[in-house]
């Protein structure tokens, strides 16, 4: 069993719309926070990858909304590295209300490895190693349960 990486984010007043719930696009931003923090957890950053000429633009994004997040809620962001292809990688996400565990949203993003000009590249060795570490971390965390 694998375990997702977990991060938390508080819903700020500016994250909400006139109905008092989190604006829909913010869920994708929270996906990004989860993904970014997962990279940090395995010892790297997007900046470091970009400095080495590897960019990971979003190629596809999907979000299924279940329950609204509201101002001052704390969201638990669960992120899992899902797969890597020749030049693509996918991350899966679940956003949960920290206090009651309600699923707020689920989704995924697919990224393509490119150079700074947008030319598709095979994932570089460092990225492959980071993805391997993400998989190992998820398996290790899952075996502790």
Specify the residue positions occupied by each region the protein language model found.
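Catalytic strand-loop segment that frames the active site of acyl-thioester-processing enzymes
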Residues: 1-38
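HotDog/MaoC-like acyl-thioester-processing domains
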Residues: 3-7, 70-71, 81-145
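Hydrophobic residues in beta-strands and at strand termini
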Residues: 9-13, 65, 113
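A broad, structural micro-motif
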Residues: 22, 56-58, 104
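Short, flexible helix/strand-to-coil boundary loops that buttress conserved ligand/catalytic motifs
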Residues: 23, 42-43, 135
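Residue-level recognition of specific faces of alpha-helices
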Residues: 27-30, 55-57, 92
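Solvent-exposed, charged/polar functional surfaces in cytosolic regulatory/catalytic domains
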Residues: 37, 64, 133, 137
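Hydrophobic beta-strand-centered segment that forms part of the acyl-chain substrate-binding groove
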Residues: 38-89
């Amino acid at each position: 069993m694998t375990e997702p990486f977990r991060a938390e984010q508080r819903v700020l007043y500016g994250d909400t719309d006139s109905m008092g719930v989190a604006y829909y696009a913010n869920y994708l931003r929270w996906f990004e926070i989860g993904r970014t923090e997962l990279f940090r957890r395995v010892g790297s950053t997007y900046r470091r990858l970009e400095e080495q000429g590897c960019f990971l633009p979003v190629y596809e994004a999907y979000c299924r909304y279940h329950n609204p997040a509201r101002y001052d809620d704390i969201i638990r962001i669960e992120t899992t590295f899902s797969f890597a292809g020749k030049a693509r990688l996918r991350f899966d996400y679940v956003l949960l209300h920290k206090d009651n565990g309600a699923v707020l949203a689920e989704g995924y993003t697919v990224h393509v490895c490119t150079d700074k000009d947008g030319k598709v590249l095979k994932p570089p060795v460092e990225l492959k190693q980071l993805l391997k570490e993400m998989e190992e971390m998820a398996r290790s965390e899952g075996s502790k349960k």
